């Protein structure tokens, strides 16, 4: 802000805090951010059933906070802390186009089922059909599985492996891929029975392993695929982790305790990525027979960031003066 012909950075931050809702009332702003996320999606994207993935992103928080702060969630140690601001997103990949469709703030007391329901409700509001849903091990519990059994689309979840020899670890056996059913009891959720697909693949140096590797997936709903096909389908989920890495490249940093301000920065960053993909596929593409040729090398993310900065400078004016303060 100091380089622009406009208000100072501290003035902007103060005014922004005055406009944003208090941390306890983020629902309205969350809805506005979700509308902004999908404001420039291709029309054809919203008319077809899409493969979707949901996941959590943990952003480390190193500041002081109240013990009962709902915006701070505990997690595995990362970047020197076990305290995080946590967000959940729902994401799709269609013809190599990656778009974030929904975003929600995850509070400390919330279960993963709560946030999954919120994300799916957002997508239903867009009238987007889900062809297939991919979830990681963080969503593997009986409450989520029971809820997904009531949904009209199939879901693939990475199975959590527990036990030394028994439990789900006993399913990782044999040298051939296979399908079985598994009944899991829980002390807090109802007992659930579900299909498990075990895919066997030779690592050949991948996954930092050698020899035979086994991958187990829970399949909820009707899905007539071989376990190896399930394995390859599930690899689509890793696009969502790519979106988190890119989001962190364009996300504004802050030391503020305000969870609303931090949610705003995450929402703006994801919107910038959605716009980047939209511009590449609509403006940086060469028509040809069949699928269009998108010239990704002409608009890398670094250049997109610089373009946005140039637009801000053109609109706000760039300050070329250096003011030397007088001696006291």
Features from the language model and the residues they span:
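An anionic, glycine-rich sequence signature occurring as long contiguous blocks
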Residues: 151-248, 305
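Short, solvent-exposed helix-loop connector elements
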Residues: 225-234, 246-266, 283-286
């Amino acid at each position: 802000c100091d380089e622009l012909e406009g208000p100072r950075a501290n003035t902007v931050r103060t005014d922004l805090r005055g406009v944003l809702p208090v941390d306890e009332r983020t629902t309205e702003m969350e809805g506005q951010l979700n509308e902004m996320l999908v404001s420039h999606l291709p029309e054809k994207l919203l008319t077809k059933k899409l493969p979707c993935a949901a996941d959590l992103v943990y952003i480390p928080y190193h500041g002081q906070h109240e013990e009962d702060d709902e915006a701070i969630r505990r997690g595995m140690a990362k970047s020197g802390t076990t305290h995080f601001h946590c967000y959940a997103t729902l994401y799709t990949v269609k013809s190599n186009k990656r778009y974030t469709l929904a975003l929600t703030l995850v509070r400390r007391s919330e279960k993963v089922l709560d946030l999954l329901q919120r994300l799916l409700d957002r997508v239903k509001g867009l009238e987007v059909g889900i062809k297939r849903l991919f979830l990681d091990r963080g969503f593997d519990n009986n409450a989520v599985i029971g809820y997904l059994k009531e949904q009209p689309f199939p879901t693939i979840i990475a199975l959590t492996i527990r036990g030394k020899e028994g439990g789900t670890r006993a399913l990782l056996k044999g040298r051939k891929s296979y399908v079985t059913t598994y009944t899991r009891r829980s002390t807090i959720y109802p007992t659930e029975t579900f299909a498990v697909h075990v895919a066997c693949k030779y690592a050949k140096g991948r996954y930092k392993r050698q020899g035979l590797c086994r991958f187990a997936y829970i399949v909820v709903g009707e899905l007539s695929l071989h376990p190896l096909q399930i394995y390859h389908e599930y690899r689509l989920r890793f696009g969502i982790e790519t979106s988190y890495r890119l989001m962190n490249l364009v996300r504004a940093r802050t030391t503020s305790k305000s969870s609303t301000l931090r949610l705003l920065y995450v929402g703006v960053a994801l919107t910038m990525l959605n716009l980047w993909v939209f511009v590449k596929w609509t403006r940086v593409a060469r028509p040809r027979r069949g699928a269009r040729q998108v010239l990704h090398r002409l608009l890398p993310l670094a250049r997109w960031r610089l373009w946005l900065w140039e637009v801000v400078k053109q609109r706000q004016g760039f300050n070329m003066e250096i003011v030397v303060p007088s001696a006291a």
